[in-house]
Amino acid sequence: MRTLYPEVTPFEHGILCVDDNHRLYYEQCGNPHGKPVVILHGGPGSGCNDKMRRFHDPDKYRIVLFDQRGAGRSTPHANLTNNTTWDLVADIEKLRVALGITRWQVFGGSWGSTLALAYAQTHPEQTTELVLRGIFMLRRWELEWFYQEGASHLFPDAWDRYIAVIPPVERHDLISAFHRRLTSEDEATRLAAAQAWSLWEGATSCLYMDQDFIASHENPHFALAFARIENHYFVNGGFFEVENQLLRDAQRIANIPGVIVHGRYDVVCPLQNAWDLHKVWPKASLKITPGAGHSAFEPQNIDALVCATDSFV
C-alpha cells in the first residue's frame, strides 16, 4: 500500500493580490521544472496544510498550493465579501498565469473536488488531468443529508453537540440557523457556532475516529473561516445556476483524463455523488476504497490518490 511522499519544503511562496480586498497565500514545492499540479483544499474555508504537499512525487511534480479567499494564510481572514465559486475559479486562473504555467493537473477533495470540476468545466484547455476525492456537488439533498437529517442517525452523539447551540424552535432549518449566528455582530456567538459546525465535520470525516483531527477543528482561527465560508457557500447554493450544474456540464470535461477516489463509508459526502459523476464522465476511472471514509488521510484513500498521481508521470 502506498503512503504519502516524505515531507517537503516549499521552494517558493508568496502573496497574490486578486482584487482590492483579497490577498491569497500560495506556495510551490517539488521540482520547479516538473509536471505542474494545483492542489485545491476543501471546505470551502479549510486552507492548506503541510501534508497536502505529499500526494505527488516531488521529483516529478511542480506542486502548487494556495489558500482560497478568507482561508488559511490568505487575508482578510474568514471574509465573505466577493467570495464565490466563480471568484475562486478566476483566482486559480490568475495564479496559473502569474506562475507562467500553461496547463496543469487539478487535484482536490470534498469542496476541492467541487471547485476542481467548476474550474475544469470553465477552463478545460488548461486542465491536463483531474484527480478527485470525496465528491461533493452542493446539491440540496447532499446538504440536507449532512446538515439536517441523515448523517445524524449514524453519529447521534456528535449530532447532539452540533445542534446544542441552536434552539429547538430553529432546528427545522439548521443551515439558516447557523448562518444567523456565524454572521452575528457578537464575537462569542460567532465562535460558538463556528466551533460546533466545524467539530461536527471533524467528528464524521474518518471511518476510525482520530481525536487529534477532531480537536484541530475546534481551533478558533480554523473554525471561524471554515464554518463561516462553508455556510456562506451553502446558503447560496454554491453560487451555481442550477443545483446539478456540475453534472449538467460534464460534457465539457468529457475528454479530460481523471481519477475519482471515494470512500465506501464516506458519511460527509456519500458515495452516490461519485457514482453520479462517473456515469456522466465515463473517461474517468472510479476507485471505491472499501475501508475508508471521507478524509484524504485515511490509509486506503492515500494509497489510491498516490497511485493516481503516479500514473500521470
Curated annotation (Swiss-Prot):
It comes from the Bacteria. InterPro entries: AB_hydrolase_1, AB_hydrolase_fold, Peptidase_S33, Pro_iminopeptidase. Keywords: Aminopeptidase, Cytoplasm, Hydrolase, Protease. GO terms for molecular function: aminopeptidase activity. Gene3D superfamilies: alpha/beta hydrolase (3.40.50.1820). Residues 35-298 form the AB hydrolase-1 domain. Disulfide bonds: none annotated. Pfam families: Abhydrolase_1. GO terms for biological process: proteolysis. Its EC number is 3.4.11.5. It is found in: Cytoplasm. The active site is at S110 (nucleophile), D266, H294 (proton donor). Coiled coil: none annotated. It catalyses: Release of N-terminal proline from a peptide. The keyword Protease applies. GO terms for cellular component: cytoplasm. PANTHER family: PROLINE IMINOPEPTIDASE. Belongs to the peptidase S33 family. Specifically catalyzes the removal of N-terminal proline residues from peptides. This is Proline iminopeptidase. It comes from Xylella fastidiosa (strain 9a5c). The gene is pip.
